[in-house]
């Protein structure tokens, strides 16, 4: 159904005479799957058992893992999937010229969102590749003079693994601790910078606890010490205002699927003045100014550009709406359940990412109980691990609370009804699971669990 609808929409987009655009889908309305609905809990295709009728999917509350494709983004992409399929690097015919023009328009849209020059935007396959290019590319280019990097203990796994890879090559890496709030101590950052430090990499918004780092202050420190500053902004671009010049950011990683764009595409901002030099990670045709060889996927970058344009237009509205829904979720859970802890700084925090720990409840058990709501206990990249979140451990959360954490994601298409349903089910199952917990029973009897000396058998 979805494929047939896509072909019909593409044909209309390419062949229809000019006229007024159809109205965008109204926020909060349930749309049919064939209409490319981003909303959760919509009927799924039932080709395997059509007689069974529509199957309801869970409500989607995991927007830090990925976001649904905005229908307006899909509309922008469709012509380049069907009719305008030329290679944007083919300079001898109209097919290539059309795709190149679309690619450069997308580059402008991405640059406009972060206050950059379009020539400073390099398209990649996503934030993971962008982070690798930034960290490994800068470190290797300046390795003859500078062999030291600085990052934090709460970065995304791809940043931490890139740094560990560089350590194996002989580089030195300082992993800054964070405070209980999840925010770094700027004095510790200043003290960690050495004469041979080439790069500082600190993420803008944490993907697990939503904490916002003081990016502008970090940028000023790095600029004054003549050290390049990279930020992984996958969870921040399009959600909070960012300006690479005002914040003195030298490199920035961007992801398409975290801002209601397609998966498989991202970008890296690399400053031109003063120029940041980067060693390319892959060899090939020298596309993207030699920094990222490989044919640029026109439909995907068009989608990324459209997502950035929509985000720029609606950022203020989205932020107010998401803040209101997030506050509703937090307050309604906390007023109904005792012993609930919000992880991370509540003030310096992106409201769409809420990480709560429910004492005396195992997080995995709660996730299984909440089968009607799509949630996670942390980063999607490490969700298969049963170990407690390294981010929560870094902010000093004890192991039991770290194991009991759930991340709630509120996004552009989340409705008030979905928030209320999630709250209702969460309260219901936390109470049920606590009633089954001997630890909860002991606490209700007034026993201090910390005073008990446990023995192994």
Swiss-Prot record:
Residues involved in pyridoxal 5'-phosphate binding: 127-128, 235, 255, 257, 295
Chain positions with Cysteine persulfide modification: 381
N6-(pyridoxal phosphate)lysine found at: 258
Cofactor: pyridoxal 5'-phosphate
Pfam families documented for this protein: Aminotran_5
Family affiliation: Belongs to the class-V pyridoxal-phosphate-dependent aminotransferase family. NifS/IscS subfamily.
Protein name per UniProt: Cysteine desulfurase
Organism of provenance: Pongo abelii (Sumatran orangutan)
């Amino acid at each position: 159904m979805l494929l047939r609808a896509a072909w019909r929409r593409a044909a209309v987009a390419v062949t229809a005479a000019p006229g007024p655009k159809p109205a965008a889908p109204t926020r909060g309305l349930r749309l049919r799957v064939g209409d490319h609905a981003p909303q959760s809990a919509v009927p799924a295709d039932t080709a395997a058992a059509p007689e069974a009728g529509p199957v309801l999917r869970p409500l989607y509350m995991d927007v830090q893992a990925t976001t649904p494709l905005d229908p307006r983004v899909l509309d922008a992409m469709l012509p380049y999937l069907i009719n305008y399929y030329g290679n944007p690097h083919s300079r001898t015919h109209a097919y290539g010229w059309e795709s190149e023009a679309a690619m450069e328009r997308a580059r402008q849209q991405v640059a406009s969102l972060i206050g950059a020059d379009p020539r400073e935007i390099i398209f990649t396959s996503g934030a993971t590749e962008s982070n690798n290019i930034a960290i490994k590319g800068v470190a290797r280019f300046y390795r003859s003079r500078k062999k030291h990097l600085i990052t934090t203990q709460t970065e995304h796994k791809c940043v931490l693994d890139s740094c560990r890879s560089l350590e194996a090559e002989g580089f030195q890496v300082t992993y800054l601790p964070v405070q209980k709030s999840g925010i770094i101590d700027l004095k510790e950052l200043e003290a960690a910078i050495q004469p041979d430090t080439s790069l500082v990499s600190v993420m803008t918004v944490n993907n697990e606890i939503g904490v916002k780092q003081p990016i502008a202050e970090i940028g000023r420190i790095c600029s004054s010490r003549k050290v390049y500053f990279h930020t992984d902004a996958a969870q921040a671009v399009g959600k909070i205002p960012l300006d690479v010049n005002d914040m003195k950011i030298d490199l920035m990683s961007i992801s398409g699927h975290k801002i209601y764009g397609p998966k498989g595409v991202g970008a890296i901002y690399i400053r031109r003045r003063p120029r940041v030099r980067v060693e390319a990670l892959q060899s090939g045709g020298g596309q993207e100014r030699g920094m990222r060889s490989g044919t640029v996927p026109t439909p995907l970058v068009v989608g990324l550009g459209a997502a950035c344009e929509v985000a720029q237009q609606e950022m203020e509205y989205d932020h107010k709406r998401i803040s209101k829904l997030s506050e509703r979720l937090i307050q309604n859970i906390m007023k109904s359940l005792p012993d609930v802890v919000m992880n991370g700084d509540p003030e310096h925090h992106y409201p769409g990412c809420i990480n709560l720990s429910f004492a005396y409840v195992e997080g995995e058990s709660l996730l299984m109980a909440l089968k009607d709501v799509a949630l996670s206990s942390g980063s999607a990249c490490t969700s298969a691990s049963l170990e407690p979140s390294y981010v929560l451990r870094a902010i000093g959360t004890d192991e039991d609370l770290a194991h009991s954490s759930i991340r709630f994601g509120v996004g552009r298409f989340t409705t008030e009804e979905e928030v209320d349903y999630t709250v209702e089910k969460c309260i219901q199952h936390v109470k049920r699971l606590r009633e089954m917990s001997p630890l909860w029973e002991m606490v209700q009897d007034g026993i201090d669990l910390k005073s008990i000396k446990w023995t192994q058998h």
